[in-house]
């Protein structure tokens, strides 16, 4: 194809696709979000409900939080069902998939957001070996198991689907100094590489992408000393921490028709802190 001249507008997309701007609507879709009791998972669930999707809300132990997310999603006029599962356990993943299929009939978007907390509460006192075990069990193994199950479900439905996995923007840059970065890069780097491989295997009817959050205002960020938070803020080109809603907006895009030609990619949502 020749390069368009100044002022020239291309009238058709390759392959005969309609060149009109695609929509960010998720109307009529069914989405499963794990780790939906709070934080990023809750923000994604509410953004999906606002975009027109019905949502299944996966949680491990915080049922109250999942119910609160469900109430807010229902206020947007959408169906929202909390479903308990520990994605580190293969039997729970199978049961979760069966529950979604029975309740909603299908799943169009499966978001593996659940992750192990190794930085706050009692988990903060664990050894780095114990923290690594937790991260690998939940963040990596759980994501792999759940993604395989999602592919199984989506291949059985004519519409295919979308899988979104949660990584970390710093895996693109080798992380930072210290054990913190090493254990997170081990788990989240695995999620990134696995997702790229799965995108090839699941194509052409299933898209697989990765979200790479940077410094986001979650429970961990709130627990940091103010001096540390300010130092981090100064290092971010856009001059602020991200919010769970920033991640949610990216998740809506990746699940929508606007991203219909995007697969096997990581979308880093980080204010430019890793480029």
PLM regions: where:
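Conserved glycine-rich cofactor-binding loop
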Residues: 30, 37-38
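Short, small/polar-rich loop/turn modules that mediate ligand/substrate recognition or access, typified
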Residues: 203-207, 262-264
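Catalytic loop of short-chain dehydrogenase/reductase
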Residues: 116-117, 155, 164-190, 195-203, ...
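Catalytic Tyr-X3-Lys loop
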Residues: 127-145, 164, 184-191, 233, ...
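The beta1-alpha1 cofactor-binding region of Rossmann-like NAD(H)/NADP(H)-dependent oxidoreductases
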Residues: 63-64, 84-95, 129, 245-246
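Amphipathic alpha-helical dimer-interface segment in Rossmann-like NAD(P)H-dependent oxidoreductases
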Residues: 98, 138-158, 171, 199-204, ...
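Conserved mid-core segment of classical short-chain dehydrogenase/reductases
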Residues: 94, 117-133, 175-183, 221-226
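C-terminal helical subdomain
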Residues: 3-17, 192, 210, 226, ...
